């Protein structure tokens, strides 16, 4: 396998259909509840296994993708360390997801790296073990390794499979970078949303507890949300900056996308309760 290129490993985006912050622990981490669903819009990674342990990354965005570079290479190095694998890899990243938008681009790239190389290096680690490695790289990485829509709580690491409606989404991408750390450190952030139980999950009132604060700090996010709310139920994902509106039909979302002001960018994607990475793995 050392010379064979394994192409088209998807690293899908996710949406937080809601994000509720329930409190703050003594160690500073926040207790939260959120609902993750994937969309069929992805980065793509290609891998070529090498006989030496060296790791090399190429991307279509050069230095602009430095954060993702780090996570991809750190993921590969961690897998080498945990598994004792002496092989290496040359990796190509086709970056399509916006950086720092709250849709999980860097975390998803890291997860796909772990899943793909676990297969290509034949290291045979279980999904649970890969998820434990992924958690060292970021709180969202295990969700992408798990590959199923999930209700998450705790600091985001406790996952339960759920099956929300697979809507069509119009995702809008404000041209701002939101610092997750700054949002979670802000004293104005609500931290007292009552917890939902799994039984009341689908009937509960969904919101993003970070949304008002991010909109206040970033007028472009507020403007984008206000525009989208004219057409559909809309929320921010994660700590932003991306916002999404949900539609029953693809054409409805495309029609609204066609009305998008020239200073906004967006995409239409389908919700998916099984990720494209999980589907790719099932085909092997």
Curated annotation (Swiss-Prot):
<dbReference type="GO" id="GO:0050515">
    <property type="term" value="F:4-(cytidine 5'-diphospho)-2-C-methyl-D-erythritol kinase activity"/>
</dbReference>
<protein>
    <recommendedName>
        <fullName>4-diphosphocytidyl-2-C-methyl-D-erythritol kinase</fullName>
        <ecNumber>2.7.1.148</ecNumber>
    </recommendedName>
</protein>
<dbReference type="InterPro" id="IPR014721">
    <property type="entry name" value="Ribsml_uS5_D2-typ_fold_subgr"/>
</dbReference>
<comment type="similarity">
    <text>Belongs to the GHMP kinase family. IspE subfamily.</text>
</comment>
<keyword id="KW-0418">Kinase</keyword>
<dbReference type="Pfam" id="PF00288">
    <property type="entry name" value="GHMP_kinases_N"/>
</dbReference>
<keyword id="KW-0067">ATP-binding</keyword>
<keyword id="KW-0808">Transferase</keyword>
<keyword id="KW-0414">Isoprene biosynthesis</keyword>
<dbReference type="GO" id="GO:0019288">
    <property type="term" value="P:isopentenyl diphosphate biosynthetic process, methylerythritol 4-phosphate pathway"/>
</dbReference>
<feature type="binding site">
    <location>
        <begin position="98"/>
        <end position="108"/>
    </location>
    <ligand>
        <name>ATP</name>
    </ligand>
</feature>
<dbReference type="InterPro" id="IPR013750">
    <property type="entry name" value="GHMP_kinase_C_dom"/>
</dbReference>
<comment type="function">
    <text>Catalyzes the phosphorylation of the position 2 hydroxy group of 4-diphosphocytidyl-2C-methyl-D-erythritol.</text>
</comment>
<dbReference type="Pfam" id="PF08544">
    <property type="entry name" value="GHMP_kinases_C"/>
</dbReference>
<dbReference type="InterPro" id="IPR004424">
    <property type="entry name" value="IspE"/>
</dbReference>
<dbReference type="InterPro" id="IPR006204">
    <property type="entry name" value="GHMP_kinase_N_dom"/>
</dbReference>
<dbReference type="InterPro" id="IPR036554">
    <property type="entry name" value="GHMP_kinase_C_sf"/>
</dbReference>
<dbReference type="InterPro" id="IPR020568">
    <property type="entry name" value="Ribosomal_Su5_D2-typ_SF"/>
</dbReference>
<comment type="pathway">
    <text>Isoprenoid biosynthesis; isopentenyl diphosphate biosynthesis via DXP pathway; isopentenyl diphosphate from 1-deoxy-D-xylulose 5-phosphate: step 3/6.</text>
</comment>
<dbReference type="GO" id="GO:0016114">
    <property type="term" value="P:terpenoid biosynthetic process"/>
</dbReference>
<keyword id="KW-0547">Nucleotide-binding</keyword>
<feature type="active site">
    <location>
        <position position="140"/>
    </location>
</feature>
<feature type="active site">
    <location>
        <position position="14"/>
    </location>
</feature>
<dbReference type="GO" id="GO:0005524">
    <property type="term" value="F:ATP binding"/>
</dbReference>
């Amino acid at each position: 396998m050392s010379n064979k290129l394994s192409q088209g490993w998807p690293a899908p985006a996710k949406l937080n259909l809601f994000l509720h912050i329930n409190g703050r622990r003594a160690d500073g981490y926040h207790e939260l509840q959120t609902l993750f669903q994937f969309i069929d819009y992805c980065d793509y990674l290609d891998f070529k296994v090498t006989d030496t342990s060296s790791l090399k990354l190429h991307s279509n965005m050069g230095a602009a993708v430095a954060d993702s570079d780090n996570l991809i290479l750190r993921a590969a190095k961690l897998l080498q360390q945990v598994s004792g694998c002496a092989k290496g890899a040359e990796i190509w990243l086709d970056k399509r997801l916006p950086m720092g938008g709250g849709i999980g681009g860097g975390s998803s790239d890291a997860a796909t790296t772990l899943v793909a190389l676990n297969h290509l290096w034949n290291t045979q680690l279980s999904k649970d073990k890969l998820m434990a490695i992924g958690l060292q790289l970021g709180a969202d990485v295990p969700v992408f390794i798990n590959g199923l829509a999930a209700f998450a709580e705790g600091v985001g690491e406790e996952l339960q499979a759920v099956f929300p409606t697979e809507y069509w989404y119009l995702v809008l991408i404000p041209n701002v970078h939101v610092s997750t750390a700054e949002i979670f450190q802000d004293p104005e952030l609500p931290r007292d949303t009552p917890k939902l139980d799994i039984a009341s999950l689908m009937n509960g009132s969904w919101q993003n507890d970070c949304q008002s604060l991010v909109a206040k700090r970033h007028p472009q996010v507020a403007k984008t949300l206000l525009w989208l709310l004219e057409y559909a139920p809309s929320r921010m994902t994660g700590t932003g900056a991306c916002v999404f509106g949900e539609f029953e039909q693809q054409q409805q979302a495309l029609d609204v996308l066609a009305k998008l002001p020239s200073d906004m960018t967006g995409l239409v994607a389908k919700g998916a309760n099984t990720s494209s990475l999980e589907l790719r793995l099932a085909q092997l």
